[in-house]
């Protein structure tokens, strides 16, 4: 039983060891000379304008959450579409219920005005 999972365990161990070794060596070897230029926020090579600690509207976060929600919907629908014939009527009903729940949530968000940009 362990033989089946041994390659995955080795892969995870190598990844963790490599990550920790990279962090350790970079902190030991890297230069630690902070200056005002190094601590300034980077804006695509342009001179920084204003403060980097600016507040954003909540609407940006709502749109981001909706994007993630519908991205997850696509993640669930892809395997369902691949296994469509094997799942039978149960799979169709289950995915239909999932889409209806998402659609009701979308209508709720729309009625609340979260998609209105003013």
Swiss-Prot record:
It is a multi-pass membrane protein. The chain crosses the membrane at residues 1-21, 60-80, 87-107. It is found in: Cell inner membrane. The keyword Translocase applies. Its EC number is 7.1.1.-. Gene3D superfamilies: NADH:ubiquinone/plastoquinone oxidoreductase, chain 3. Coiled coil: none annotated. Keywords: Cell inner membrane, Cell membrane, Membrane, NAD, Quinone, Translocase, Transmembrane, Transmembrane helix, Transport, Ubiquinone. GO terms for molecular function: NADH dehydrogenase (ubiquinone) activity; NADH:ubiquinone reductase (non-electrogenic) activity; quinone binding. The keyword Phosphoprotein does not apply. GO terms for cellular component: NADH dehydrogenase complex; plasma membrane. NDH-1 shuttles electrons from NADH, via FMN and iron-sulfur (Fe-S) centers, to quinones in the respiratory chain. The immediate electron acceptor for the enzyme in this species is believed to be ubiquinone. Couples the redox reaction to proton translocation (for every two electrons transferred, four hydrogen ions are translocated across the cytoplasmic membrane), and thus conserves the redox energy in a proton gradient. Belongs to the complex I subunit 3 family. NDH-1 is composed of 14 different subunits. Subunits NuoA, H, J, K, L, M, N constitute the membrane sector of the complex. This is NADH-quinone oxidoreductase subunit A 1. It comes from Geobacter sulfurreducens (strain ATCC 51573 / DSM 12127 / PCA). The gene is nuoA1.
């Amino acid at each position: 039983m362990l033989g089946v999972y041994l390659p995955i365990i080795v892969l995870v161990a190598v990844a963790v060891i490599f990550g920790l070794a990279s962090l350790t060596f970079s902190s030991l070897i890297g230069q630690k000379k902070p200056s005002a230029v190094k601590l300034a926020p980077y804006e695509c090579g342009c001179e920084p304008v204003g403060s980097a600690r600016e507040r954003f509207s909540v609407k940006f976060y709502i749109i981001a959450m909706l994007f993630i929600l519908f991205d997850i919907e696509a993640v669930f629908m892809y395997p369902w579409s691949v296994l469509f014939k094997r799942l039978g009527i149960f799979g169709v009903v289950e995915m239909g219920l999932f889409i209806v729940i998402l659609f009701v949530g979308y209508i709720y968000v729309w009625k609340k005005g979260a998609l209105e940009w003013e």
